[in-house]
Amino acid sequence: MTNKEGFMFPQKSELRKIEISDISMELPNLKDIEESKSVAIGKWIADWIKTDLQSGKIKINGIIPSKADFAYRLGVSVGTIQNALRYIEDLGYVESKQCIGTLVRDYTKQA
């Protein structure tokens, strides 16, 4: 199955869930930030994806932790995480797939 951008979706059984404990980067410091929490968290998630894709720790089509897991770990609302994910989805780092979760995408192939 492909989406509107031409990404091929693997079968659900082929997808690997990335646990919150798998994240190799330190959590962001959300105190004294100049931008919104959503943008700061979005940039942090994008940096984590870039770093861990390059190192091979995560792979394309990995399912990132749930919004609730991120919100709990970062001490913010699920809405803040939802906005952060929307921000990085627009940049091509992830793609939300209903009934599956949010998948890591190859951000280097964006036009």
Tell what function each PLM region has.
Residues T2-G79, N83-E95, I100, D106-A111:
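Extreme N-terminal segment that seeds HTH/winged-HTH DNA-binding domains in transcriptional regulators
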